[in-house]
Design a protein with these regions (language model features):
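Hydrophobic, aromatic-rich transmembrane alpha-helices
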Residues: 1-4, 37-51, 175-190, 312-314, ...
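Long extracytoplasmic/lumenal interhelical loops at the membrane interface
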Residues: 141-146, 150, 296-366, 383-391
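Alpha-helical transmembrane segments of multi-pass inner-membrane proteins
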Residues: 117-144, 163-233
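Aromatic-anchored transmembrane helix interface
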Residues: 60-71, 83-108, 115-124, 128
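A membrane-periplasm/extracellular boundary helix in multi-pass inner-membrane enzymes
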Residues: 228-294, 318-319
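Loop-to-helix entry and N-terminal half of a specific, functionally important transmembrane alpha helix
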Residues: 8-16, 199, 361-362, 372, ...
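Transmembrane signal-anchor hairpin modules in multi-pass inner-membrane enzymes, especially those
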Residues: 1-78, 84, 111-118, 185-195, ...
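Transmembrane alpha-helices of multi-pass inner-membrane enzymes
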Residues: 179-182, 405-458
Length: 458
């Protein structure tokens, strides 16, 4: 069985096919396809041919406790909401996490991860013409129909949405962030030229600016610095080169400054009646609602980012302490689902504006802590250490190992996004990227562990 082909099908279905199909037809039922393929992947796991015994160390065995979180979420939903809501909630929020245990248990080998990552690169190249089409054709059409103020979230690449109503710009931004991190790590390992890394980072950053993904724009310099300073599995890698680090810092600072000015000008043109505020002041003011503990959008009822935490702390025990600790069940906050959750009408607000809010309401404080703790443990145990001699490695081996610092940084970015966006709990594209990256990091870690054990034996 060619498991790499199955995982590549997961990738193309999640990142390209479903998004484009939904974007063109407006049919959201296409989003069931990644769920069905994830279930099929899990069912095919026992049929996987093993070329060596599966050996998990104690840290990897602890990660299998993730199944406990799934049981907690599914059983709590089934008892409180019934079978149909359980299926829909699992499909919307947790189904793609099945890819993580599949990869942990050996569904793909390291060579197959390498092939899949090459496909990720081609998916990025595909975004460029799609984004240009959306900028040159879709955005002007939408502005002409609905006005300058309605142009937000128009640039979504192949990640899906409504051409006239916005889409998954955040997921596009995170995908571009992953590409930036990978290319910088490859450059640091001496695998690509300065021209290549500059092209990929500039192209990815430009897409983030066009898509107006402020979170990625402001966070990317810190994560790129993390990748540059991170240790590697390859011995002899410098922890840092001060001159290059300063150049990268200056370049990223300049890029962020340009991005902020472009976004500020865009906001200024959209808010024509914004008084005497300057463009930069208007941009900074647009971020203010994020930290407002009492922000509620009067038109949509959507809570602000920080507001969601205060609102949960005040109302999370509405049906008792057990719901505060273990949640109300999956899908109970999802206002855009086939079966909308009952909590939004109950409180007359939208509770699913951030992934952290969704977790707290649906799996409770205990489930949220378990989820975050397991992801932190995974990132910690996958951190690279200099164990392998470069002279004994092929170029393909070094390239595969170079992915690990980028994967760790991307996982950190996704964790930091929990209190900011709903991507990780509600958007299949982001869910696939997150769980695949974590699973691939485990595969690379396992291959390094086996290689070092073989060297010790010999």
């Amino acid at each position: 069985m060619n498991s790499a082909l199955i995982m590549q099908a997961n990738l193309l279905l999640s990142l390209v096919i479903c998004g484009l199909a939904q974007y063109v037809t407006g049919i959201t039922a296409f989003l069931w396809l990644p769920f069905l393929l994830a279930i099929a992947t899990l069912m095919l796991l026992p049929l996987q041919t093993r070329y060596s015994p599966l050996r998990l160390d104690y840290q990897e065995k602890v990660l299998l406790l993730y199944s406990g979180l799934l049981v907690l979420a599914l059983l709590g939903t089934l008892l409180q909401q019934g079978g149909m809501v359980t299926i829909i909630g699992f499909k919307n929020e947790l189904a793609l996490s099945l890819l993580l245990p599949c990869l942990l248990l050996g569904f793909c080998r390291e060579s197959q991860i390498y092939r899949i990552m090459k496909l990720v690169e081609w998916v990025f190249y595909l975004q460029i013409p799609v984004v240009l089409f959306q900028v040159l054709v879709v955005v002007p059409k939408r502005v002409a129909m609905r006005g300058e103020f309605e142009k937000w979230d128009s640039v979504v690449g192949t990640f899906g949405g409504d051409p006239m109503g916005g889409g998954n710009t955040g997921a596009l931004g995170f995908f571009c962030l992953l590409v930036m991190l990978i290319k910088l790590s490859e450059f640091r390992h001496g695998l690509i030229s300065r021209r290549s890394v500059a092209f990929h980072i500039l192209a990815a950053f430009a897409i983030c600016v066009l898509a107006e993904v402020k979170f990625v724009i402001l966070l990317s310099p810190l994560l790129l610095a993390w990748v540059w300073l991170s240790p590697s599995y390859v011995r002899g890698m410098k922890s840092y080169d001060l001159k290059r680090l300063l150049l990268i810092a200056l370049a990223m600072t300049a890029l962020v400054a340009v991005a902020v000015m472009v976004l500020a000008a865009s906001y200024s043109s959209a808010f024509e009646g914004a008084g005497q505020q300057g463009a930069i002041a208007l941009f900074i003011d647009s971020l203010g609602y994020i930290f407002d503990p009492n922000h509620i959008n009067p038109e949509t009822g959507e809570l602000g980012r920080v507001t969601t935490l205060f609102f949960w702390a005040s109302n999370g025990d509405h049906h008792g302490l057990s719901n505060l600790l273990f949640g109300y069940g999956l899908n109970t906050t999802n206002h855009g689902s086939t079966l909308p959750g009952f909590l939004n009408p109950l409180f007359n607000v939208l509770l699913d504006s951030t992934s952290l809010s969704v977790l707290l309401w649906e799996v409770g404080l205990m489930g949220t802590l378990i989820f975050i703790a397991l992801i932190v443990l995974l990132l910690w145990c996958c951190r690279p250490r200099p164990l392998l001699d470069r002279l004994l490695l092929s170029t393909a081996d070094v390239r595969l190992l170079s992915y690990q610092p980028a994967f760790i940084a991307f996982g950190i970015a996704c964790l930091l996004s929990l209190p900011y966006s709903q991507l990780l709990m509600l958007i299949p594209v982001q869910q696939f990227l997150f769980y695949f990256v974590l699973g691939a990091a485990l595969v690379i870690r396992s291959s390094v562990r086996q290689a070092t054990r073989s060297c010790e034996v010999s």
